[in-house]
Amino acid sequence: MITSIELRNFRNLENYKVLINRPLVIIQGLNGVGKTSILESIYFAATTKSHRSSVEKDMIQYDKPYASVKLIEDSKLHEIVLTPNGKRTTINKSEVRKISDYIGQLRVVMFAPEDLMLIKGSPSERRYFLDMELMQVSKTYLRNLNSYKKILKQRNALLKKNRNLTDYTFLNILGEQLYDVGIQIFDERQKFIEALNQKFKTIQTKYKDFEVEMLYEPNVTKENFLKHLKTKQKQDIMYETTTAGIHKDDFKLLYKGLNAKDSASQGTSRLIVIELKLALLEWIKEVTKTDAILLLDDVLSELDLERQNLFMSQLSKNHQVFITTALPINGHIDFQKIVLQEGETINAK
């Protein structure tokens, strides 16, 4: 459980610290006061990434040289410092030089309004979801993904520089390396999606008439991937890129057997993604034997009162949960309320 959050120059929070004393934390305040930034800081400290922007320097407050996040979780101090030149990560004040050794020390599951792009967005956004979640629990996946990206970059560079290439020896060597790593990523993604579908079945017993399924859509089968790399060199040379592989994979979220992208309303889409995050939470617990921290940004908006109560009742008491809201939350559940105003806590009890 996180017991302390300390931020410096992070977004609009210049000098912020709050102590946490309960598993369920409600962060309340008007829009723009920094509620989402608190969740983003926790996500950043866990994954070294922002869920809001690919431009990391945006997290550094304007005209400041750095941003930092310190979290105390189960007596372990996690710290990440961001400058325009890079990141520095430490655990208990000892530097962790390899990001691969740092990721997975603290596991989180995030829901944000941007996650609706898992339904409406591009394949690259859905691949990013697969990669981020698998990286948190599997060092092997992270290592394979980094290797795949490195080999793919080499192969694409070779394709671009040699439009008249006739000797495919080196191209084929890179192709074999790409295949060997790629099929391992393929297998892990497939197992991950199968596992989430099993979790969906359990969750759906509590959500009446709400059938959700995840359908993996690999760009190419393992057999055809190898065949492509061995026989389609001319095609790849012509396009100056590797035109097939796991870097083009996708998945669909189905609602009652139909593609949610085409059949689900905005409110239903939100519930589908919420269900996905709850399934993910249970999957992480099953695989790692640890409880991930759940971060919910504006999760209750667009849900009617019945759905809100149902959702709140599904939150496991084993997981620490942070929820942001612009509206007051009432009910019998025990929670710590943090009232935020212009980047400062005016009440935390």
UniProtKB/Swiss-Prot annotation:
<keyword id="KW-0238">DNA-binding</keyword>
<dbReference type="GO" id="GO:0009432">
    <property type="term" value="P:SOS response"/>
</dbReference>
<keyword id="KW-0227">DNA damage</keyword>
<dbReference type="Pfam" id="PF02463">
    <property type="entry name" value="SMC_N"/>
</dbReference>
<dbReference type="GO" id="GO:0006302">
    <property type="term" value="P:double-strand break repair"/>
</dbReference>
<keyword id="KW-0742">SOS response</keyword>
<dbReference type="GO" id="GO:0005524">
    <property type="term" value="F:ATP binding"/>
</dbReference>
<dbReference type="GO" id="GO:0003697">
    <property type="term" value="F:single-stranded DNA binding"/>
</dbReference>
<dbReference type="InterPro" id="IPR042174">
    <property type="entry name" value="RecF_2"/>
</dbReference>
<comment type="similarity">
    <text>Belongs to the RecF family.</text>
</comment>
<dbReference type="InterPro" id="IPR018078">
    <property type="entry name" value="DNA-binding_RecF_CS"/>
</dbReference>
<protein>
    <recommendedName>
        <fullName>DNA replication and repair protein RecF</fullName>
    </recommendedName>
</protein>
<dbReference type="GO" id="GO:0006260">
    <property type="term" value="P:DNA replication"/>
</dbReference>
<dbReference type="GO" id="GO:0000731">
    <property type="term" value="P:DNA synthesis involved in DNA repair"/>
</dbReference>
<keyword id="KW-0963">Cytoplasm</keyword>
<feature type="binding site">
    <location>
        <begin position="29"/>
        <end position="36"/>
    </location>
    <ligand>
        <name>ATP</name>
    </ligand>
</feature>
<dbReference type="InterPro" id="IPR003395">
    <property type="entry name" value="RecF/RecN/SMC_N"/>
</dbReference>
<keyword id="KW-0067">ATP-binding</keyword>
<dbReference type="InterPro" id="IPR001238">
    <property type="entry name" value="DNA-binding_RecF"/>
</dbReference>
<comment type="function">
    <text>The RecF protein is involved in DNA metabolism; it is required for DNA replication and normal SOS inducibility. RecF binds preferentially to single-stranded, linear DNA. It also seems to bind ATP.</text>
</comment>
<keyword id="KW-0234">DNA repair</keyword>
<keyword id="KW-0547">Nucleotide-binding</keyword>
<dbReference type="GO" id="GO:0005737">
    <property type="term" value="C:cytoplasm"/>
</dbReference>
<dbReference type="InterPro" id="IPR027417">
    <property type="entry name" value="P-loop_NTPase"/>
</dbReference>
<keyword id="KW-0235">DNA replication</keyword>
